[in-house]
């Protein structure tokens, strides 16, 4: 017997979303490490319709004096959406959102890095969104962590990010672009998976305390699943 699920059922079922996923299901994910020869570290990530390339350069001596810290390195992140990454072609160059996400990304990654080993140095992380389909800030953080590990930067742990949110009064994991547009709330989270220390936590929208707790638990669980893909990418890269 073949069961046919209609579009109306997809929209109203608590366990099936418009793209066919369960409420606690991630989009398909692929990560590769070390794909750029001239970067010190690099990664490529596909997460649903997102395609993101990350290059890491450094640590290297900070040429600008105001960037120098006598006791540690400085991490700089540049998040950029390519003009062709979205349906409505965007203007080249950083906009307000890109600047904000660049800052948030650096803050999320910093706790994992042993920066005191490289005083007066800078580590540059370039995140290029080639195609965007919702959740690019979390995907960028996840890919950047792999690229930093590929660069050999000493790390206390990886950083992995994922979001949960509320769509149609249902708390769901890993919002797609359409769900993000139509949804009632979004909770991006980044953690150090070994200790589950939170390095990024944002909340946009309306959630009850119980819904927020559920969203946070779902996002952390999503992070732990994504971390397995991070580890596999590095194992393939280094044959371990």
UniProtKB/Swiss-Prot annotation:
Its EC number is 3.1.13.-. It is an enzyme of class 3 (hydrolase). InterPro entries: ExoRNase_PH_dom1, ExoRNase_PH_dom2, ExoRNase_PH_dom2_sf, PNPase/RNase_PH_dom_sf, Ribosomal_Su5_D2-typ_SF, RNase_PH, Rrp41. Belongs to the RNase PH family. Rrp41 subfamily. The keyword DNA repair does not apply. Pfam families: RNase_PH, RNase_PH_C. It is found in: Cytoplasm. One of its GO terms (biological process) is gene expression. This is Exosome complex component Rrp41. Component of the archaeal exosome complex. Forms a hexameric ring-like arrangement composed of 3 Rrp41-Rrp42 heterodimers. The hexameric ring associates with a trimer of Rrp4 and/or Csl4 subunits. Catalytic component of the exosome, which is a complex involved in RNA degradation. Has 3'->5' exoribonuclease activity. Can also synthesize heteromeric RNA-tails. GO terms for cellular component: cytoplasmic exosome (RNase complex). It comes from Methanothermobacter thermautotrophicus (strain ATCC 29096 / DSM 1053 / JCM 10044 / NBRC 100330 / Delta H). The keyword Electron transport does not apply. Keywords: Cytoplasm, Exonuclease, Exosome, Hydrolase, Nuclease. GO terms for molecular function: 3'-5'-RNA exonuclease activity; RNA binding.
């Amino acid at each position: 017997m073949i069961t046919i699920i209609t579009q109306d059922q997809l929209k109203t079922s608590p366990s099936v979303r418009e793209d066919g996923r369960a409420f606690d299901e991630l989009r398909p994910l692929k990560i590769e490490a070390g794909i750029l020869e001239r970067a010190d570290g690099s990664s490529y990530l596909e997460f649903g319709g997102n395609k993101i390339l990350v290059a890491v350069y450094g640590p290297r001596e900070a040429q600008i004096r105001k960037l120098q810290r006598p006791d540690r390195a400085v991490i700089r992140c540049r998040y950029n959406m390519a003009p062709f990454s979205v349906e409505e072609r965007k203007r080249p160059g950083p906009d307000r959102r890109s600047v904000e996400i660049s800052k948030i990304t650096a803050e999320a990654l910093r706790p994992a890095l042993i920066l005191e080993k490289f005083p007066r140095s800078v580590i540059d992380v370039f995140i290029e969104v080639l195609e965007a389909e919702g959740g690019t800030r979390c995907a960028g953080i996840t890919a950047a962590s792999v690229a930093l590990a590929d660069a050999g930067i000493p790390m206390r742990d990886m950083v992995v990010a994922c979001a949960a949110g509320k769509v149609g009064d249902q708390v769901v994991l890993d919002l797609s672009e359409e769900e993000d547009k139509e949804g009632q709330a979004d909770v991006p989270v980044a953690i150090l998976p070994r200790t589950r220390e939170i390095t990024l936590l944002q909340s946009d929208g309306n959630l009850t305390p119980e819904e927020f707790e559920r969203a946070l638990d779902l996002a952390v669980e999503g992070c732990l699943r994504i971390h397995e893909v991070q580890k596999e990418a590095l194992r393939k890269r280094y044959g371990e």
